[in-house]
């Protein structure tokens, strides 16, 4: 299997800066150039050992099962390729290594002729969703792949093959994630992909996310459009162009059926829509309704909710019960220096306003989980989509939270039109046509679900794909088995310690932080011994890891948006390390993958980046210093932006620091952060600084990698300076087309450097 390193960050917007996205011709030429380089590579015969982990797997995008033999099926992973099993998931074989991408949105199989059609480019539109190269076709179970078009699509929503005519294929194209483009909508081929015709076009911001078809009549098709705009600082995943279309002539012509008169939502709050067709009459849809709820959630009696501070007067604030205010401060993690007396004094003196208590708590995680939107709604039509009725009798809380763009799927049982499954963070099941629900994912089922197959001959037989891999049930979801043999986890970062054998640590997308000895061998034997070489040491989206060189039991790691801990592996004790701003100050902004660093000169000194550089002299127990804002500043939006993305310290001089930001700045300090010099004026502007590192061979040498992925710009940007950033030289002109995420200098030979990109190393 190809060794791919995916280091994931937030997203940039094309229109704001005018950055050019990569054209389809550049993309194809880049692939050809990369293939030529591989043929002539000095290390092409170098063997890599797979050390795991497979105890957890990676994000599934699609599952297709042989209708005549359910022990044979294919699984597509968002950035892990396509895998095949013929023994009910006991083992899998990768069949996508000969493709020129590992990123998949959806696929379909013509089981009669064993033809596989893959739509490349994940369709979930998340921070870690990578683009594809169009539609790929294989007639020999993945030994060879042919690109059959739509190379400027970037992300594919759905692929459907006519089971009675495999040359007829319908594709829902979602389009570019971070820029507008024309290759969106519904495309159809009648000759197996030799030529394509666009059958439905909405606009350059709206693509097709789902297609489902009457199981008895391929002529009757339903498709859902999705209007969205993504930028580094904002994601608008909804719009009035999101809707449901129907075709009665096999996709040749389409009609919008989610009109205001139909009963289906048609306002600007409509987000991603998932579809499931039972027969010619009954159709289900789940919609991510981003409209605000009319009524806020109820607050517990005898408790203060942060929302009350939004419009509270100083006079009313001073009347607050001291015990209730102290409980509020303690329960919400305010620094100990703030008690009711201190806070009331600050408000009375005018140093802060009551609103500041609410703002103090509003970081990126609260926005993601606590914003009071309607969320997932289930609709049903019993007249072929002419009219729709909302079925859920209560809010489906915590199914989507605020990020329904990441899910958006629904399935109806092939044998019971009143039994449906809806999935987001959990899977929920309804046996009464969507009125009431119960959860059916249990202890050994990972959260965040993306696909579900229901056996038409045995509807209690389910195969589920989620962020942690594959699960199977034979009792309608009461019990599940894990099928996690593929090693397809998506790493944000890796690090190693100095033990013998040394341990490898890694933070993974939605799979936490794991560690294992470097000589680990992937084997099913752990099912017998009960011991897996890989150990979980953190949850959430696993982020960066730093290891104390004096004592490898001391680990610094954490999850998204700056939630970091110092962990003692021996005792299990965890110390929370995230810096806080003071009441009345502008809130700190933390990157999704906030950078951390232990000083090479003193392992008690811990650096962490928000929009400022924070320095602790005692392992993060408190923060003795914070810098000025080292970014271009805050930008209005619902995603933290203007944050630090990279930190390094020179091994030649204590306190010589360099930091990079997500909005394209690189700053250098030679006095421990007291003063800073901007050194990126002559570099390409506004690109994400994925890495900025000092050389370990030359004291004034700095390397910088910039990443245009968030502009849909996939060119490599690698620069070197030999005078502390006064002048830069580009050294990436002879590299293949791929965004660069990480750079490492060889510890023994200054002329050898290593790069990790979106398409390999």
Task: Report residues per predicted region.
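Bacterial Sec-dependent N-terminal signal peptides
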Residues: 1-24
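Beta-propeller blade termini and top-face loops
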Residues: 20-761
């Amino acid at each position: 299997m190809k060794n791919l390193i995916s280091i994931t960050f937030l997203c940039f917007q094309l229109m704001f800066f005018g950055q050019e996205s990569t054209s389809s011709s550049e993309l194809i030429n880049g692939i050809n150039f990369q293939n030529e380089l591989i043929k002539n590579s000095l290390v092409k015969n170098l063997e890599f050992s797979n050390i795991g982990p497979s105890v957890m797997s990676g994000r599934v995008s699609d599952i297709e099962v042989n209708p005549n033999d359910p022990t044979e099926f294919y699984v597509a992973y968002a950035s892990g390729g396509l895998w095949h099993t013929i023994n009910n998931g006991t083992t899998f074989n990768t069949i996508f290594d000969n493709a020129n991408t590992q990123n998949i949105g959806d696929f379909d199989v013509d089981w009669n002729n064993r033809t596989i059609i893959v739509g490349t480019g994940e369709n979930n539109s998340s921070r870690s969703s990578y683009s594809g190269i169009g539609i790929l076709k294989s007639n020999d179970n993945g030994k060879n792949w042919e690109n059959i078009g739509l190379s400027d699509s970037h992300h594919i929503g759905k692929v459907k093959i006519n089971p009675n005519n495999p040359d007829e294929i319908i594709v829902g194209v979602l389009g570019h994630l971070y820029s507008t483009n024309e290759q969106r909508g519904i495309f159809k081929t009648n000759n197996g992909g030799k030529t394509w015709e666009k059958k439905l076009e909405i606009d350059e911001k709206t693509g097709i996310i789902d297609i489902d078809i009457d199981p008895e009549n391929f002529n009757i098709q339903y498709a859902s459009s999705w209007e969205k705009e993504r930028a580094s600082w904002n994601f608008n995943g909804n719009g009035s162009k999101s809707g449901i279309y129907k075709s009665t002539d096999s996709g040749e012509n389409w009609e919008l059926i989610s009109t205001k008169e139909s009963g289906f939502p048609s306002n600007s709050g409509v987000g991603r829509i998932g579809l499931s067709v039972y027969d010619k009459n009954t159709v289900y849809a789940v919609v991510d309704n981003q409209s605000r709820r009319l009524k806020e959630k109820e607050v517990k009696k005898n408790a203060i909710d942060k929302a009350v501070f939004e419009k509270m007067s100083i006079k009313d604030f001073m009347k607050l019960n001291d015990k209730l205010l102290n409980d509020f401060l303690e329960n919400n993690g305010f620094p100990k220096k703030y008690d009711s007396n201190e806070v009331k004094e600050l408000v009375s003196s005018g140093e802060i306003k009551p609103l500041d208590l609410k703002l103090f708590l509003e970081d990126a995680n609260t926005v993601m989980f606590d914003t009071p939107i309607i969320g997932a709604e289930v609709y049903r039509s019993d007249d072929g989509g002419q009219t729709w009725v909302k079925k859920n009798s209560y809010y489906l809380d915590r199914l989507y939270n605020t990020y329904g763009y990441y899910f958006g799927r629904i399935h109806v049982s092939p044998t019971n039109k009143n039994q449906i499954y809806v999935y987001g963070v959990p899977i929920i099941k309804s046996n009464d046509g969507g009125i009431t629900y119960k959860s059916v994912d249990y202890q050994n089922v990972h959260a965040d679900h993306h696909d579900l197959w229901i056996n038409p001959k045995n509807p209690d037989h389910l195969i589920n794909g989620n962020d942690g891999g594959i699960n199977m049930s034979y009792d309608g979801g009461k019990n599940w088995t894990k099928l996690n043999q593929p090693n397809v986890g998506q790493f944000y970062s890796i690090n190693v310690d100095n033990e013998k054998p040394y341990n490898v640590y890694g933070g993974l997308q939605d799979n936490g932080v794991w560690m294992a000895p470097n000589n680990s061998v992937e084997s099913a034997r752990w099912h017998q011994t009960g011991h897996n070489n890989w150990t979980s040491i953190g949850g959430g989206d696993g982020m960066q890891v730093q290891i104390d060189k004096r004592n490898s039991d001391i680990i610094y790691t954490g999850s998204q948006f700056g939630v970091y801990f110092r962990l003692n592996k021996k005792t299990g004790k965890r110390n929370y390390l995230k810096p806080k701003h003071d009441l009345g100050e502008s809130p700190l902004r933390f990157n999704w993958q906030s950078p951390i660093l232990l000083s090479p000169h003193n392992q008690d000194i811990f650096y962490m980046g928000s929009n400022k550089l924070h320095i602790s002299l005692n392992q993060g127990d408190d923060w003795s210093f914070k810098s000025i804002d080292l970014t271009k500043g805050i930008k209005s939006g619902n995603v933290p932006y203007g944050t630090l993305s990279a930190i390094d310290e020179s091994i030649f001089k204590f306190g010589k620091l360099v930091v990079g930001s997500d909005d394209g700045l690189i700053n250098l300090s030679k006095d421990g952060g007291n003063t800073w010099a901007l050194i990126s004026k002559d570099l390409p502007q506004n690109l994400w600084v994925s890495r900025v590192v000092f050389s370990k061979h030359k004291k004034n040498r700095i390397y910088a990698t910039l990443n245009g992925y968030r502009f849909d710009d996939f060119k490599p940007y690698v620069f070197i300076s030999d005078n502390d950033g006064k002048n830069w030289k580009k050294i990436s002109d002879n590299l293949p087309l791929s965004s660069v995420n990480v750079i490492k200098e060889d510890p023994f030979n200054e002329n050898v450097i290593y790069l990790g990109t979106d398409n390999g190393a």
